[in-house]
Amino acid sequence: MGPILETGVASDTRTNQDSWWRGACLYEVYLRSFQDSDGDGEGDLKGLVSRLVYLAQLGVDGIWITPFFPSPMFDSGYDVADYRQVDPRYGTLDDFLEVVNTAHELGLKVIIDQVYSHSSHLHPWFSMSRSSRDNPKADWYVWADPKPDGSLPNNWLARFGGVAWEWAAERRQYYLHNFLAEQPDLNMHNTKVQDEFLDVMRFWFGLGVDGLRLDVANFFMHDPELRDNPPAKLAETPANPYYMQQRLYDRSRPENLLFLERMRKVAGERMLLAEISCDWQVERMAEYTAPGRLHTAYSFALLAPELDGNVVADAVEQAGHGDSWPTWAFSNHDVIRVASRWNAAGNPGKITMLHALLVCLRGTVIIYQGEELGLGHGNVPRGKLRDPEAIRFWPLDRRRDGARTPFPWDDNPNLGFSRAEEAWLPCDPAHSELSVARQNAVPGSILAKCRDLIALRKASPVLRLGEFEVVDQGRDRLIFRRILEGKRLLCAFNFGGQAINLSRHGLPTVLSGEARGGVLSPGSYLIAEEY
């Protein structure tokens, strides 16, 4: 593939054949925990290549791969030390090209994580930037003088606890870090920094990548005046004081939108998927996915601790206004797995209902690795924790490491993930009963039904592209229609403990699920054609 240039205004033709991502089902690969090929206890690119057939047979349209770039791993690779290379623990650039080529041969698109908000403190850019105030990279990061009494520039707090400022004696200044001190924030107000990342985009697109997932995309810009954030109005004090502020000035700045437009000109119709973390997600999603900006953004609304019919209906309806195209996920590498959050672990019927709900939503959907197996949240003892947030806030925050335990392939040591004596995170013995090998041997397993549901979505333009219309909703139920060109599908989900009567809807052709005598039992679902 030749060089990709930043020219003209990006096309927003929604019927373009390159808009494969609209209605697609993606699969998040947490690379470090997916498959180890060399016995070092960590997943890698060759391991991923060996399992791509499994993902193709699952039926997904593409994969999103978490960071595999050189990193000191203070935040599991989201602290990047080189944006154009592969960390040796994961392999080489040739290994990555093998992933891309093999995936494409199997009909899978490849999306990779990009972390532009901040770099590693060990990146050469930062090493130079902190060395003095007059070097070529001096203004590539966010630096601020202390107040006259030596105190911090403002009241901003870091996401992982503590203040968002760290002192650098070399410059006699503080630098901003919205996450760890080892993750200094880049100064995206500097167009030279923007230009560098546009070149990074071109580099990966030139290697055949089909799209980018943009980590914390609303953190790219900060308020140049460094104004204090106002206090949040809370009913009780949270464990992490970060949530005690309204995030008005340290993220979600309007200046960010112009950079997104520059990114879109480079990407064209290659997918740009934004992670947006803020209190006004619907408004931000609409801004970030307006014509000429990003293709889609995913909401945290369905990653909430508790979900019911009202939460799902309200989130999908709010995100569906105008021409915006949402992306939905029930799990990812940062939250408690959905089977545990929704008390579905050990309940195959309820897990399958959740899978059915996801594939019926309007938008692009993402399955997190292991979700198709019905995995509950992994158990990681305190002494084995790797996540800096969990270590700092133990025992009140156990989200991330438990979502990242190694993938269970079979009954071999380390559940088939690695031949190492010990994996980088402990395997959860409870996951062995849900391994791929065991489920492949059982007709009608959670995995088998998940494959069927993905295939149903893939074969149905109505489910992938149709409009969304709520018929009935409540904490215990959600019934909606998907409508496209006169075709209507009724999708019904029973979250409660009482049966729901669907007979008045008339259900001539049931596509998936069951409602005996027109009655939907608790923890079950129905997808049916409707006249």
What is the predicted function of each stretch?
Residues 2-5, 19-23, 225, 230-248, ...:
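Loop/helix patches that line or flank the sugar-binding groove of alpha-linked glycan CAZymes
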Residues 2-202, 206, 219-280, 407:
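Acidic/aromatic-lined carbohydrate-recognition and catalytic surfaces
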Residues 63, 212-214:
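Hydrophobic residues within beta-strands of alpha/beta enzymes
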Residues 71-75, 118-125, 220-224, 280-284, ...:
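Short catalytic/ligand-binding loop motif for oxyanion handling, primarily in non-cytosolic enzymes
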Residues 495-506:
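Surface-exposed beta-strand/loop patches in extracellular or lumenal glycoproteins
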Residues 505-513:
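Solvent-exposed beta-hairpin/edge-strand motifs
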